Amino acid sequence: MVKTEEMLNNLEELINTPSVVGFYPEIHKKLAEMVGKFGYELEFDNKRTAYVRVPGKDSSKIVCVGAHLDTIGMQVRHVMDNGWIEVKNLGGVNFHNVEGENVYIHTRSGKTYEGMVICKSHSTHVFDDARSRERDKFNEA
């Protein structure tokens, strides 16, 4: 029997766990805890792809169900003197789609900062080039 509320809670917890491309420790820990509740163990290959083996009634056939644990994101490359940040695109961010999005910056020291992606010319009533300025890593912060 499917426990819908528990399944939705688990899904929400996974979705809200930071897991930008190449940054898997938190999502792997969370997934290991979840599958552990069912008596299973999380395994990894050399690329850190996670697997859970669930024995079936007929072990002569193997079924693999896959899903992404990571998401697209950005990596901070440099903090400029004026406080703006220079980012590197991870996994295919389309800068036209992320303007105005809330973001979290996770540091090597374990701190997390909350911010927002904005374009350098973000308002048409203030910046003449707001409609024409390219939305890319050089004009977003």
Write out the residue ranges for each language-model feature.
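N-terminal hydrophobic/helix-forming segments and targeting peptides
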Residues: 1-141
